[in-house]
Swiss-Prot record:
Entry protein name: Non-specific lipid-transfer protein 3
Purpose: Plant non-specific lipid-transfer proteins transfer phospholipids as well as galactolipids across membranes. May play a role in wax or cutin deposition in the cell walls of expanding epidermal cells and certain secretory tissues.
Disulfide bridges in this chain: C33-C80, C43-C57, C58-C105, C78-C119
Keywords for this protein: Disulfide bond, Lipid-binding, Signal, Transport
Keyword check for ATP-binding: no
InterPro entries: Bifun_inhib/LTP/seed_sf, Bifunc_inhib/LTP/seed_store, Plant_nsLTP
A UniProt-annotated Pfam family: Tryp_alpha_amyl
One GO biological process term: lipid transport
Organism: Prunus dulcis
Record-stated family: Belongs to the plant LTP family.
Length: 123
């Protein structure tokens, strides 16, 4: 099983996908990596172990989704998260739980959640 730090990084990947569905270009990203981590920390236990989803996890997922208002925000978050998960091993079960977070939290994203996401393609 992956460590809590590794799972947090995997959960952060979900944030990228949550952020990609909100529109409008802007010159500078306003969402920090710290905000991403803070919003997704409540999701670690669920991604690590499954079971019941903590309501504060969904609050964080929805909050992060609402923070990503611009293309620059979404690309910046994507790059931050890709760096965080780079080289971190995880199981298919963990990846599946992380990928399912947006839907379980009522956030509809039209993108595949994957470490191979091309951040430059995010609009």
């Amino acid at each position: 099983m992956a460590s809590s730090g590794q799972l947090l990084k995997l959960v952060c990947l979900v944030a990228v996908m949550c952020c990609m569905a909100v529109g409008g270009p802007k010159a500078m990203a306003a969402v920090s990596c710290g905000q991403v981590v803070n919003n997704l920390t409540p999701c670690i236990n669920y991604v690590a172990n499954g079971g019941a989803l903590n309501p504060s996890c969904c609050t964080g997922v929805r909050s992060l989704y609402s923070l990503a208002q611009t293309t620059a925000d979404r690309q910046s978050i994507c790059n931050c998260l890709k760096q965080a998960v780079n080289g971190i091993p995880y199981t298919n079960a963990n990846a599946g739980l992380a990928a399912g977070l947006p839907g379980k939290c009522g956030v509809n994203i039209p993108y595949k959640i994957s470490p191979s996401t091309d951040c430059k393609s995010i609009k």
